[in-house]
Structures are given as C-alpha cells and as structure tokens.
C-alpha cells in the first residue's frame, strides 16, 4: 500500500497492485472489529506455528492480513515505532542509515499526530495516530502504582524514550481504523497510473 502510493505520486510510473484477498471487510473498518479478525479466514491467512516441546506441542496462531492493507487491517492498532536503542545498535553493527536519528525523519513524515514534541513527531503525514480514548481511574491507578515502584511515567513513548509506562497510541481516527489501505491506497486509487486488483492469488508473474 505504502509503496504503491509513493511510486504513483509523481505520475511517472504505472503500478499494478495485486492482493490475494478481498478489498476490505466490514470488521476492518471499526476498531472493535479486530477481535473478530483473529481467526476469520475471509480476511486472515490464519497461519499457525509448528508444534514444539516448548509449547506443549500446541500450534500458536500467527494472524496475517489477507486483504488490502495486509496485517494493518486486522491488527490491534497499537502504534509503536520501535526502541531507539535497537536502531542505534543496528547502525553500530554496520548498517548505515539505520540509527534512530537516521530513521526519525521517516517516522515523522509518515504520521499525523497532535501530541508530543515537534522535533520528534510528525503533523502532516498520511497515517493518523491518536492517543487512546479509553481512560479512567483504573488506568491511572495502574500508572501511579508503577511510578511508586520506580517506573517512570512516559507520556509519549514514541519520542525515543520508551522505558516507562503510559497510555497507548493508536492508529485510530474518528472511530475508524487507520490501516495502510485507508491512509495510503484510498488517496491513490483514483490516479490514472495505478490499478488495484483484489482477489488475485498469484503464483508467478510473467513479464
């Protein structure tokens, strides 16, 4: 979804986007629907792990999205950039361009978030990120208890300082899931140089 949007933005390239699954599903549109998608073959590949001794020979579900937007259309919508130290470690191991400082501009460009500091958060990106609306005395009591145990309160865990406790940020806006299909494909679908073909399970491309 993201790549198709970016490649067709200039009008210089033509893109055919093939999706094995359907264009969308009713339950992908509303946040509460994610629990219905965990084992729904119409929108989920329903992969499972192989039995192992460590799991008492159980098969563990590995949900993967089978519709436009992929797994962003069925996941729990919690938005986490990743631990800054992990990116820095990758750079130290020789992966140039992967430090947190290097990837921060990309994170900022992709998101639209009203909170946090301007130097670390994006305001005009396609992906809508919001603070969770599910607040109340219980959540605050848990956070206060963590603080009493020495865990710092982290108002914006996507700022680069993730150690601590705080409320989650979500890819939800105005009561709707913000999947990559909604944020990247919907704005691009009317461009003359993109063709989106759903229900197209593909084994090989003959060029």
Please give the residue ranges for each predicted region.
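N-terminal redox-cofactor-binding region of secreted/periplasmic oxidoreductases
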Residues: 1-207
């Amino acid at each position: 979804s993201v790549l198709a949007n970016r490649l067709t933005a200039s009008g210089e390239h033509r893109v055919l986007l093939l999706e094995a699954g359907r264009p969308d599903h009713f339950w992908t549109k509303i946040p509460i629907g994610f629990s219905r998608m965990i084992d729904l073959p119409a929108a989920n590949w329903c992969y499972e792990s192989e039995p192992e001794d460590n799991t008492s020979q159980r098969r563990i579900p590995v949900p993967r999205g089978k519709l436009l937007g992929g797994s962003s259309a069925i996941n729990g919508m919690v938005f986490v950039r990743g631990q800054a130290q992990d990116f820095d470690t990758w750079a130290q191991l020789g992966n140039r361009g992967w430090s947190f400082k290097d990837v921060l501009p990309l994170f900022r460009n992709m998101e639209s978030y009203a909170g946090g500091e301007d130097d670390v958060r994006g305001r005009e990106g396609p992906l809508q990120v919001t603070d969770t609306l599910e607040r109340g005395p219980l959540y605050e009591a848990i956070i206060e208890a963590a603080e009493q145990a020495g865990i710092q309160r982290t108002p914006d865990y996507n700022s680069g300082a993730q150690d601590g406790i705080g409320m989650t940020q979500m890819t939800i806006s105005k009561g709707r899931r913000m999947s990559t299909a909604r944020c990247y494909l919907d704005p691009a679908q009317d461009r003359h140089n993109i063709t989106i073909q759903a229900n197209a399970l593909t084994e090989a491309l003959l060029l």
